Design a protein with these regions (language model features):
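C-terminal motif of bacterial Sec signal peptides marking the signal peptidase cleavage site
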Residues: 14-16
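N-terminal presequence-like segments and the immediate start of the first folded domain
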Residues: 18-89, 93-106, 112-161
Length: 161
């Protein structure tokens, strides 16, 4: 049997068409154990005691990004479209500061305060990634978000060396 790169197996699992959860846990544990270094990204502002992203080997775990405009310290606007665009710009800023870009994103988690905003968020979100190369995604409705934001987007990216 050919050795399949760990990230491919993880992606297949996230899509529901791959190995079992135990297999994925083993692969992730091996990836983390074999990672040469763990580094915290500090090139972006945060609003709490956490890193904007943590890199372990070829994986980059990006903390949730809200629609906070770094120039003003305020939310980009009250509408889902404006906050989604800004959250994605913030995600892009963290990615580019680490040598990654949107093409490296393999999974996103989107938190919405109101699932009725899903379609409008989806129009903006879909334009951020190259068509046909969308990451796996989970979208959940939550009761509240930091700074009373209406969307937060977290991501995992992979970049081969």
């Amino acid at each position: 049997m050919k050795l399949i790169p760990g990230i491919l197996i993880i992606a297949l699992f996230l899509c529901g068409c791959g190995p079992s959860e135990d297999d994925v846990r083993t692969i992730v544990a091996n990836e983390l154990a074999n990672a040469s270094a763990r580094s915290e990204v500090t090139n972006a502002e945060v609003i709490g005691p956490y890193s904007p992203a943590v890199r372990i080997g070829n994986l980059l775990f990006v903390s949730g990004q809200i629609g906070l405009d770094p120039a003003t310290g305020q939310l980009a606007g009250p509408e889902i479209e404006a906050q989604t665009q800004q959250a994605l710009r913030n995600l892009g800023s963290v990615l580019s500061g680490t040598g990654f870009d949107s093409s490296h994103v393999v999974q996103c988690t989107v938190y919405l305060k109101d699932m009725n905003d899903f379609q409008r968020m989806n129009l903006i979100y879909g334009g951020y990634f190259q068509e046909g190369h969308y990451p796996a995604r989970t979208t959940v409705e939550v009761s509240n978000l930091p700074r009373n934001a209406i969307i937060e987007i977290a991501a995992i990216a992979f970049k081969s060396t």
